[in-house]
A protein has these predicted regions:
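A detector of single, family-specific signature residues
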Residues: 1-288
């Protein structure tokens, strides 16, 4: 079959492909993971469309290496084209229809370096969440023994050992809190190790070094931006990028009457959070 466009509904073990050849014959079939590359190679489509979901960037790099055009679509833009109940075949057809729209916006394919950066940031964020949860857990247990510590992870880590040593605790309680503080120290060392890796990567990447010169931007924000948008060529202006991150007001305009609400809060939640933290650090809240 001569296919100009092939849509693939991605999965872990089972995939569904959908396409229409030049004679109008519809191709819709289920393909196993082991056979996907072989089947796509036999069909030789000019372009391949997929949702920008789990493993999409891996497969996109595979198809690009094989000389195919790749169109990654935000799942939110595919949903309006789903007809009837959801299943793999319907999803693949919806991806095909969405990819054919002349005004459709596509997601740039991430390189392995970008995905490495994103994985590093996600691992660091997970460790920070675990540390915060453990601090709150330890703080709550200490309060049951009359030990109240100030807010903030750094003040907690600095004052907790002294407070525990001076508290009237049983041997068992001291052993419990010693174990919890040991876990906190281990998490802190792991976070510092990942921080050092981020600083090293920032120094070796030209785009990161340029971004780090901006006010309120350091290695963490610079590498997070590069990991998410690379050099930003997909945006026509800085405002477009701000809208993509979700930093501009949500708009609901009808009948010629504009309505603006709070920030959109869509897209990359992690990047938006880091940028807001950087802005607050540069200009603390309440200071003009």
């Amino acid at each position: 079959m001569a296919l100009e466009l092939l849509a693939i509904d991605l999965g872990k073990r089972a995939f569904h492909i959908y396409g229409i050849d030049t004679d109008g014959v519809i191709l819709s079939r289920k393909v196993s993971r082991a056979k996907l590359a072989e089947v796509v190679g036999d069909l030789e489509p000019t372009a391949i469309a997929m949702e920008a979901c789990a493993s999409a960037h891996y497969w996109a790099r595979c198809w690009l290496a094989a000389g195919r055009e790749v169109r990654l679509i935000n799942p939110r833009f595919v949903k309006p084209f789903v007809k009837g109940s959801k299943n793999d075949a319907v999803d693949a057809e919806a991806i095909f229809e969405a990819a054919m729209r002349p005004t459709m916006r596509f997601v740039p394919v991430k390189s392995t370096d970008q995905q490495d950066l994103q994985s590093l940031h996600r691992a660091r964020d997970r460790l920070i969440c675990q540390r915060t949860a453990l601090i709150n857990h330890t703080r709550g247990l200490l309060a049951e023994y009359g030990v109240v510590l100030p807010q903030g992870p750094w003040r907690f880590m600095a004052q907790a050992p002294t407070a525990i040593a001076g508290a009237d605790l049983s041997d068992l309680a001291r052993a419990i809190f010693g174990e919890l503080m040991g876990q906190l120290d281990d998490l802190d060392r792991r976070i510092q190790k990942l921080d050092a890796m981020i600083v090293t990567l920032c120094r070796t990447n030209e785009t990161c070094r340029r971004l780090a010169k901006l006010p309120g931007v350091g290695p963490i924000i610079a590498t997070a931006i590069v990991g998410s948008v690379n050099d930003g060529r997909q945006f026509r202006s800085g405002r477009e990028m701000a809208a993509w991150i979700g930093l501009v007001p949500r708009q609901y305009t009808t009948g010629g009457k504009p309505r603006l609400g709070g920030i959109g809060r869509r897209a990359n939640h992690y990047l938006r959070r880091q940028l807001i933290h950087g802005a607050r650090h540069r200009q603390p809240v309440g200071q003009a």
